[in-house]
Amino acid sequence: RQDYDSYSRPMLTYEVHAGSWRRTKDGEYLSYRDLADQLIDYVKKMNYTHIEFMPLCEHPFDGSWGYQITGYYAVTSRFGTPDDFRYLVDKAHENGIAIIMDWVPGHFCKDEQGLRHFDGQTLYESDNEQLAENWEWGTTNFDYGRTEVQSFLISNAMFWFEEFHIDGLRIDAVANMLYLNYGRKDGEWTPNKYGDTGNLEAMDFLKKLNESIFKYHPQALMIAEESTAWPLISKPVY
């Protein structure tokens, strides 16, 4: 990982979908090692400081751009091996470029090889279908009220920092996590104990997530994609 503090210097971020940024002459994906040579050279010439990759966790549907995940602990094999991805990150750091990855702790896809009804039961999602179903995206919401689900997700975030030395995570679709009525009509959601729309368990999870990451990686970038102007969304909790 780089030895400089992203918080104390200007940032210019280049967002990339690894599968479509550039292809080979035969229309095939570039590998992580190809990207290490071509993408980093381009980003450096354009004076960007950070590369933000759309999700690189394993996912079954190319058209989802990686946002409907089955394998949270697997870097997608579309572009190579875990060591190939490590090579890409190392090459970026050698050139003074930080790596951010989009991460999706809000919902997961329903494919049979994924987390939904993992052993025939609702392990990662709520028993309450109203809470579990994400009708807007055709996916399943995580149940943040389960400590084992919180542990799974926080451990996964830590995994990407520890195993691949990335510099930050951009947390996808935070509004979907924070609001019980996100994308829902009247009658499709139940207020919290205070009678409002906030998902209290999701709020607690996000606080624990940031506390855990910054305890071990104080220079990490934790970026919320939050579309509703939720007050103090970026206020430190540590």
For the regions a language model picked out, list residue spans one by one.
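Alpha-glucan (starch/glycogen) binding determinants
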Residues: 1
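Substrate-binding/active-site clefts of carbohydrate-active enzymes
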Residues: 4-11, 17-197
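Conserved alpha/beta catalytic core and glycan-binding cleft of carbohydrate-active enzymes
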Residues: 165-167, 182-238
